[in-house]
Amino acid sequence: KIKIQNTYKKKPIFILGMPRSGTSLIEQIVSTHSNVYGAGELTILPKIMHKSIWDKYTNPEELLTFIREEYLSKISEFNVNQEFVVDKMPFNFFYIGFILKSIPEAKIIHIHRNPMAVCWSNFKANFFDNVGMNYAHKLETIGEFYLIYNEIMKFWSETYSDSLINIDYDKFVIDYETSSKNIISDIGLNWENEILKFHENNRVVETNSLLQVRSKVYQDSSKNWKKYKKHLSPIMEILKNNNIEF
């Protein structure tokens, strides 16, 4: 633990998981609350966690204090009235332990989706203009990246089981009203009926999920991969060989 020297008015909500797992939808729903600002996929934390800080800060407390001050000072620059700021960079799942140790007041929402559905969605999204998504260009590397994600999240979930808001996307879409109310409650906010009109929220969305967040919840998206099952054997074999059910 670190000594909290400076407090900030803005509190972060991290929404993370595999890309195409439903992070944009959950951000859209959460940010429809009047006290939540959806900032999109921020690169603040990955930049902070650049390897150079490991040479500069050898003392764990100094390192965590640096992460805290850098991150919170950056999100405090958003000139908005809302108390909570959503950071939906999916790859922040790499840093969950550092987040919870340096920013204990942060809320972390982890979204899990059917493995084959999320892997297929990564492949069909055509992330060719996104350097950070190079793994998504081949079926084999998508499967391998999923294994990395799965192992990391297994570790964090076991270590910080009481500190994560876990959402099963495929269950969420079946009863999104009840699920949304649970999320808002877990964040520590009061429910607002306007949240159910999340698809009318005209905030800027800069991901491949624009159409989804402007529409009502679609329940069958995780079944689409089955239409292409015979072409997806490389991913299926990787998942089966590592005892991952889909």
Residue ranges and their predicted role:
Residues 1-12, 56-58, 62-83, 102, ...:
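PAPS-dependent sulfotransferases, especially Golgi type II membrane carbohydrate sulfotransferases
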Residues 41, 168-169:
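A secondary-structure boundary/capping signal
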Residues 43-44, 115-118, 172-173:
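Conserved nucleotide-binding/hydrolysis micro-motifs of P-loop NTPases
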